[in-house]
Amino acid sequence: MKVRASVKKICRNCKIIKRNGVVRVICTDAKHKQRQG
């Protein structure tokens, strides 16, 4: 899980979702997991 100021899609499997007011990226590749903070 990377914590970044700006979350971006890295590959075509990445999805940007908002969960409890937190922007996250979920992906089939675990390296692409990100959270805005």
From Swiss-Prot:
Highest taxon in the source lineage: Bacteria
Task: Please give a single GO biological process term from the UniProt record.
Answer: translation
Q: Which InterPro entries does UniProt cross-reference here?
A: Ribosomal_bL36, Ribosomal_bL36_sp
Q: Does the keyword Thylakoid apply?
A: no
As given in the record, the signal peptide range reads none
The protein's GO terms of the molecular function aspect are: structural constituent of ribosome
UniProt keyword list: Ribonucleoprotein, Ribosomal protein
What are the annotated GO cellular component locations? cytoplasm; ribonucleoprotein complex; ribosome
The entry assigns this protein to a family as follows:
Belongs to the bacterial ribosomal protein bL36 family.
Q: Which PANTHER family match?
A: 50S RIBOSOMAL PROTEIN L36, CHLOROPLASTIC (PTHR42888), LARGE RIBOSOMAL SUBUNIT PROTEIN BL36C (PTHR42888:SF1)
Protein name in the entry: Large ribosomal subunit protein bL36
Q: What organism is listed for this UniProt entry?
A: Idiomarina loihiensis (strain ATCC BAA-735 / DSM 15497 / L2-TR)
